[in-house]
Each structure stands twice: as structure tokens, then as C-alpha cells.
Curated annotation (Swiss-Prot):
Belongs to the heme-copper respiratory oxidase family. It comes from Emericella nidulans (Aspergillus nidulans). It catalyses: 4 Fe(II)-[cytochrome c] + O2 + 8 H(+)(in) = 4 Fe(III)-[cytochrome c] + 2 H2O + 4 H(+)(out). This is Cytochrome c oxidase subunit 1. Mg(2+) binds at residues 407-408. Component of the cytochrome c oxidase, the last enzyme in the mitochondrial electron transport chain which drives oxidative phosphorylation. The respiratory chain contains 3 multisubunit complexes succinate dehydrogenase (complex II, CII), ubiquinol-cytochrome c oxidoreductase (cytochrome b-c1 complex, complex III, CIII) and cytochrome c oxidase (complex IV, CIV), that cooperate to transfer electrons derived from NADH and succinate to molecular oxygen, creating an electrochemical gradient over the inner membrane that drives transmembrane transport and the ATP synthase. Keywords: Calcium, Copper, Electron transport, Heme, Iron, Magnesium, Membrane, Metal-binding, Mitochondrion, Mitochondrion inner membrane, Respiratory chain, Translocase, Transmembrane, Transmembrane helix, Transport. Ca(2+) binds at residues 79, 84.
């Protein structure tokens, strides 16, 4: 259909109106065309180009995906609560549940929440810009995640599911081992998720480099802003490698290529190199935004500026660079040359240096400060303790000779859940409890939030600490049965999982009460007593010059009518 609004000519039918709006109304009412304008609600939430609304959508999506991923994890722990078959007789189904749990939590819970949710909501505020650099690109970045999630759900529920683990290693992901369409759907879902992340990363980088207000130099940017830009660079550099690897798996499965088929001259180890060249930066993509949040929260909760701001920035940069140089520590058992293993051991141990700088800087920020144990501060301190434990088990696994024994045991599961399930997730909750009054303009029950922290803290520790002992006894991961000797620690671990689910349910009740009974909050709800909460001097000295606290709660759709200036 051709509509020429200049000549008022629609498919040969002439109208006598002069203005564009009247023209469109007549076109809508003409018998051969039905076009319904979106309602205000649809336009705000489906067609949004506002960073705050898109950030809210990301957080809602992450909450839904997190509940799905938690449900899968409980199924795993219920099956492992005793030796023999408990609930899941089919090992392929068990492996499909493990794959679904990992992918839901990594790609659809942590990344959308930490990068998409907090990144979109806060970044324009932190740089003093009106919005993101590419608002409509921002919208498609979010809406690509919805079909991506649907593809993963379909892949888990049709035929035998994708029982490959999140790593998708061939030949297990090849056409002979997984003959149905499940793995293909999972690969398409990963492609969509990757495109979404790359578009978002380009948007974040452009926003930070081009939309800062005068006076907000890069060396004055809040640490969360630095965390987002470093994460975005990691995404841009690593995701294309994953896309290439899984596309080769796709063509091996469907077009008879032999990239990873030994019979045709391919090499499955090549896929492991490609996957982990993405996979190791990916774990830093998950945790670096958490570093930014924890720095902000500890500064606010201590009443001090962050100790060693520049050191924190360059530590994050170092972690990002080194993250690309250590991928083969996931592959010590594939037959690497001894010199290669020596290099990857040394490089992996070096990553502990910038990580240690960050941990000691957080402790130094707390030292001598007036600590306020608000819910976000509790989660931040919990993060520091648990992330340190996870880092120490990582130092053990970095050694090639030890990892040959620990590879694919529950020691590895315990290690990465301490840095993710208690690192990234505790950072997420810390950021949620710090900024959700700003986002919604409503207060929540602080006592209930502290109870949530303690239930979750006990639950996750009871779940994952015993897994270190199972790993030391060499219990293999991704296997649904085990000898009776492992029964005790597995039962404890499963009880901890149920406690974590109770904590998650309790968290949902806190959100419900906040939305139904929450009172309106001031610009800076964390200042006690709230006598001078609108005074700029107080806001800046109390919270490390973060601009978002100068705005109303919730901020207006376009926060800055004129550019803020920072001297």
C-alpha cells in the first residue's frame, strides 16, 4: 500500500484535508484499511524508548527467569537428596534440567538484571545524560530476549531436550547424540541472546563515551559506570567467538560439515577453545557489574568515598584483559602440552592480584567508617566474605596438577557457585535493595529485607559448602546417581536448597508489600535522620557523588531538563 501524505493520495483515493493528523485519521477510517493506534500503556511498555522503563522491563524479565532457573535447580537437588532414583529416572532429562538451569541463570537472570536492568536505569543518570545514545536500539535489545527465552524453553520441552550442559560440547551436541531439534533451538536462542547483548553493549559504550555532561570526566565517573563500560567491551570481544563456535556446531549437525567431526578431519577440542575463549570472559561479564554495585553500596553504607578509586578502576580493567588470556584452565584434562598448562596456571593465579586489590579496597573503605547495616550493606558484606571463599577455591583449581583430579567434580561446582550464586546474586540483591526505592519511589520493610538476607545466607552456604567435601572425595558433577558414601553431604546440600527457595519466596512477599503498602521516599532514602535529605552537600559527601540521588524518587522520564555540571 502506498500512502502519499503530501498529495493526500491513498491508492488513488483523494482527501481534501490539509494537515497530516487529519490525513491519518481519514486513512484509518477508510473502509479498506484498519489501523489501531496503541494505547498509552502499550506505547509505554511495548514501544518504549525510555531507558528507565526498559531497565524496569529487564528487571521484571530477570525476576521471572530467575524463578524458572531456581525451579530447575530445586529439581536437581531433590534428585540428589538421596542415592538411587528419587524423582527423575531418565538421565537425559536430568541433564536437560542442568542445561536449562545454567542457561536461565546466566543469560536470562544475571546478565539482564545487572547489565540490562541496573545499567539502563542508572547509566544515563550517572553520566548526566537525558537517555541512552540509541533509545530504540535499547528497546530491541530487550525484546530479542523474550523470543530467545522461548526458544530455550521449547528446546528443553520438545523431544528429549538438550542434555549437553551449558557448554554444548561436541560430540555430545552432535547429530548422532542429540538427533532432535532441541540443540538447534538452544543454539538459535543463544544467537538471539548474543545479538541482544552486543547491541546493548554498543549502546552502553557510545552513551558513556559521548553523552557525559561537562565536568564528568572518565576519571570522575562512578565505579558502576566503569563496571558497565568494561563489561560492554568484554561482551563485544567475546560473543562473536561463541557465535562462530555454535554456528559451526549447527552446520555440523544440519549441513554435513566436519568442523568438530573426527571422522571428517575435524577436532572437538577446537570447539572447547572457541567456547572457553568466550566462556571465561563471560564469568567476568557476570561479576564485574557486581563489583561496581558493591563499591557503590559499601561507600554509601560506610559514609566514606571508596578507598583507592583509581586502583579500583584499573583493577577492573586488569581483570577484563587477563580474562581473555586464561581460557584453557577449563581444559587441563584434554591433553595440553605441559608448558601450555604451566602458562595457564601462572596467568590464572595472576588474576588473583587485581581481585585481591578490590577486596582489600572494600575492607579499607569500611575501616574507620560509620557502618550502617542496612539491607544493601548486609548483602554487600556477605558478598565480600563469600566471594573471597570462592576466590580461594579458585586458586586451588588454577593449579593444573590439582585440577586434573578436581576437574568435573563437585569441587568445581562449589567454586563457581560461591562466586556466582553468592557473588553475582548477592550483588544483585544489594543493588536491588539500594536502588529499588529510587526506582519505584516507595519504601520497603527493612526488617523483612534483613531477614531475607539471613535466610538466603544460611541457605546458600548450607547448599554449597558441603559440595567442597564431595569434590574432595571426587564425586562427579552432572551425574544423577552416586554411591551411598556421599549421602550425608548431599542431603545437607539439598536441605540448603529448600531454605534458599524459602528465601526467594520471602523476597517476593517483600516486593508485594512494597508495591501495596510502601510509603513515598525522599531523594536520598538512606540518610538518617532525613532532615536535610535534599541538601546537595549531604548527598555528595554521603554517596560518592552519584548523580542519581539528586533526582526525585522515582526520577522523571527525562531526568535532566538541562545538563548537570560537575566542577
Amino acid at each position: 500500500m502506498i500512502i502519499d501524505l503530501n498529495t493526500n493520495n491513498v491508492l488513488g483515493k483523494k482527501f481534501s484535508t490539509s494537515t497530516k493528523k487529519e490525513n491519518i485519521k481519514q486513512i484509518e477510517s477508510s473502509s479498506f484499511l484498519t489501523f489501531k493506534q496503541p494505547t498509552e500503556w502499550q506505547e509505554r511498555w511495548y514501544l518504549s524508548s525510555n531507558a528507565k522503563d526498559i531497565g524496569t522491563l529487564y528487571l521484571m524479565f530477570a525476576l521471572f527467569s530467575g524463578l524458572l532457573g531456581t525451579a530447575f535447580s530445586v529439581l536437581i537437588r531433590l534428585e540428589l537428596s538421596g542415592p538411587g532414583v528419587q524423582y527423575i529416572a531418565d538421565n537425559q532429562l536430568y541433564n536437560s534440567i542442568i542445561t536449562a538451569h545454567a542457561i536461565m541463570m546466566i543469560f536470562f537472570m544475571v546478565m539482564p538484571a545487572l547489565i540490562g536492568g541496573f545499567g539502563n536505569f542508572l547509566l544515563p543518570l550517572l553520566v548526566g545524560g537525558p537517555d541512552m545514545a540509541f533509545p530504540r536500539l535499547n528497546n530491541i535489545s530487550f525484546w530479542l530476549l523474550v523470543p530467545s527465552l522461548l526458544l530455550f524453553v521449547f528446546s528443553a520441552t520438545i523431544e528429549n531436550g538438550a542434555g549437553t550442559g551449558w557448554t554444548l560440547y561436541p560430540p555430545l551436541s552432535g547429530i548422532q547424540s542429540h538427533s532432535g531439534p532441541s540443540v538447534d533451538l538452544a543454539i538459535f536462542g543463544l544467537h538471539l541472546s548474543g545479538i541482544s547483548s552486543m547491541l546493548g553493549a554498543m549502546n552502553f559504550i557510545t552513551t558513556i563515551l559521548n553523552m557525559r555532561s561537562p565536568g564528568i570526566r572518565l576519571h570522575k565517573l562512578a565505579l558502576f559506570g566503569w563496571a558497565v563500560i568494561i563489561t560492554a567491551v568484554l561482551l563485544l570481544l567475546s560473543l562473536p567467538v561463541l557465535a562462530g563456535g555454535i554456528t559451526m556446531v549447527l552446520t555440523d549437525r544440519n549441513f554435513n560439515t566436519s568442523f568438530f567431526e573426527v571422522a571428517g578431519g575435524g577436532d572437538p577440542i577446537l570447539f572447547q577453545h572457541l567456547f572457553w575463549f568466550f566462556g571465561h570472559p563471560e564469568v567476568y561479564i557476570l561479576i564485574i557489574p557486581g563489583f561496581g554495585i558493591i563499591s557503590t553500596v559499601i561507600a554509601a553504607g560506610s559514609g566514606k568515598n571508596v578507598f583507592g578509586y583509581l586502583g579500583m578502576v584499573y583493577a577492573m580493567m586488569s581483570i577484563g584483559v587477563l580474562g581473555f588470556l586464561v581460557w584453557s584452565h577449563h581444559m587441563y584434562t584434554v591433553g595440553l602440552d605441559v608448558d601450555t598448562r604451566a602458562y595457564f596456571t601462572a596467568a590464572t593465579l595472576i588474576i588473583a592480584v587485581p581481585t585481591g586489590i578490590k577486596i582489600f579496597s572494600w575492607l579499607a573503605t569500611c575501616y574507620g567508617g560509620s557502618l550502617h547495616l542496612t539491607p544493601p550493606m548486609l548483602f554487600a558484606l556477605g558478598f565480600v566474605v563469600l566471594f573471597t571463599i570462592g576466590g580461594l577455591s579458585g586458586v586451588v583449581l588454577a593449579n593444573a596438577s590439582l585440577d586434573v583430579a578436581f576437574h568435573d567434580t563437585y569441587y568445581v561446582v562449589a567454586h563457581f557457585h560461591y562466586v556466582l550464586s553468592m557473588g553475582a546474586v548477592f550483588a544483585l540483591f544489594s543493588g536491588w535493595y539500594l536502588w529499588i526505592p529510587k526506582l519505584l519511589g516507595l519504601s520497603y520493610d527493612q526488617f523483612a529485607a534483613k531477614v531475607h538476607f539471613w535466610i538466603l545466607f544460611i541457605g546458600v552456604n548450607l547448599t554449597f559448602f558441603p559440595q567442597h567435601f564431595l569434590g574432595l572425595q571426587l564425586m562427579p558433577r552432572r551425574i544423577s546417581d552416586y554411591p551411598d558414601a556421599f549421602y550425608g553431604w548431599n542431603l545437607l546440600s539439598s536441605i540448603g536448597s529448600i531454605i534458599s527457595v524459602v528465601a526467594t519466596w520471602y523476597f517476593l512477599t517483600i516486593i508485594y508489600k512494597q508495591l501495596t503498602e510502601g510509603k513515598a521516599v525522599s531523594r536520598y532514602p538512606w540518610l538518617t535522620p532525613q532532615l536535610f535529605s535534599d541538601t546537595f552537600q549531604v548527598l555528595f559527601t554521603r554517596n560518592n557523588s552519584s548523580l542519581e540521588w539528586c533526582l526525585t524518587s522515582p526520577p522523571k522520564p527525562h531526568a535532566f531538563a538541562s545538563l548537570p555540571l560537575q566542577s
